[in-house]
A protein has these predicted regions:
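N-terminal signal-anchor/start-transfer transmembrane helix
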Residues: 2-24
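Aromatic-anchored segments of alpha-helical transmembrane domains
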Residues: 38-47, 90-98, 140-150
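Alpha-helical transmembrane segments of polytopic membrane proteins
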Residues: 1-8, 56-66, 108-116, 159-169
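Membrane-proximal helix-loop-helix units in multi-pass membrane proteins
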Residues: 59-65, 70-138
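Membrane-interface helix termini and inter-helical loops of multi-pass transporters
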Residues: 53, 103-107, 152-157
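C-terminal transmembrane helix-loop-helix hairpin of multi-pass membrane proteins
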Residues: 1-8, 125-213
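Interfacial helix-loop-helix linkers and transmembrane-helix boundary segments
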Residues: 24-29, 51-55, 75-84
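A generic, lipid-embedded transmembrane alpha helix
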Residues: 31-55
Length: 213
C-alpha cells in the first residue's frame, strides 16, 4: 500500500477511537483560527490541480484536515460534532474505496454506495435520535458531493449515486436506532416492573386489570 493510504487509515482509526485530546489542545488554541484554516483547506483542495497518481504532497491537506476534524470533534457542540465526524471520516474512507474500485463496473461497486454505507455506520454510532441520524447522513453526503462538483470528478455518477446514497444512508441509519430505542424501553419497563411488582404489563407498561371476585 502507498504511504499516504496507510497514514489515512491510521489517522481514521485514531479519529474514531477518540484519542489525541491533549495533542489537539496543545497544537490548536483558537477555535476561530482553526475554523478559518479548515475552510481554507477545503478551498485549496477544490482548486488543487493534483490528481491521485504519483503526487506525495497530495496527502498533506488530508492529514491537516484530519487533525482539524479531531479538534472540532473535541470542542464543538453535539450536532456539529456528529456532522463533522460523519463527513470527514466517511470522506477519508471513501478515498480508500477509490483505490479499491477506481473504475466501478457494477451498481453495487460504485464508490458512492460504499461511502453511503460508511456514512450510515457513522450515523448509527454518533446519532441519538431519528432526526439527527437522517440529518447527519444527508449533510455529510451533500458536503462530499459539493466538493466533487467543484473538483470536477465523477460528474456522471453524481446524480443517481447521490440519491442512492441518501436513501441507503437514511434507511440503514434509522432502523438500528429505532430497534435500540425499543429495546431500551422494553428493558426499562421490565426493570420498573421488577421494582414495582407484577402489577404492570411487560409490553405496554400499563397496570393490569384485576377482576374482583
Amino acid at each position: 500500500l502507498p504511504l499516504g493510504i496507510v497514514i489515512i487509515m491510521v489517522a481514521t482509526i485514531f479519529l474514531l477511537a477518540g484519542h489525541g485530546q491533549e495533542l489537539c489542545f496543545t497544537l490548536f488554541l483558537s477555535r476561530k483560527w482553526t475554523l478559518a484554516l479548515f475552510f481554507a483547506l477545503i478551498l485549496s483542495y477544490m482548486v488543487s490541480p493534483y490528481t491521485f497518481e504519483g503526487v506525495s504532497i497530495f496527502w498533506v491537506p488530508y492529514l491537516l484536515l484530519l487533525s482539524f476534524s479531531v479538534y472540532l470533534l473535541i470542542n464543538l457542540s453535539h450536532p456539529l460534532r456528529s456532522i463533522f465526524c460523519s463527513a470527514f471520516t466517511a470522506f477519508c474512507i471513501f478515498i480508500l474505496s477509490l483505490f479499491i474500485s477506481p473504475q466501478p463496473k457494477g451498481y453495487i461497486y460504485e464508490p458512492f454506495v460504499i461511502y453511503s454505507l460508511v456514512c450510515s455506520l457513522l450515523s448509527i454510532v454518533f446519532a441519538y435520535s431519528r432526526s439527527s441520524a437522517i440529518f447527519n447522513s444527508i449533510v455529510s453526503i451533500l458536503v462530499f458531493n459539493s466538493i466533487l462538483i467543484f473538483r470536477g470528478g465523477y460528474s456522471t455518477l453524481l446524480a443517481p449515486s447521490a440519491f442512492t446514497a441518501a436513501c441507503l444512508s437514511c434507511c440503514i441509519s434509522v432502523v438500528p436506532i429505532l430497534l435500540s430505542q425499543k429495546i431500551t424501553v422494553f428493558r426499562t419497563r421490565r426493570i420498573f416492573q421488577t421494582e414495582a411488582g407484577s402489577s404492570l404489563h411487560p409490553l405496554t407498561g400499563k397496570k393490569r386489570k384485576r377482576f374482583k371476585k
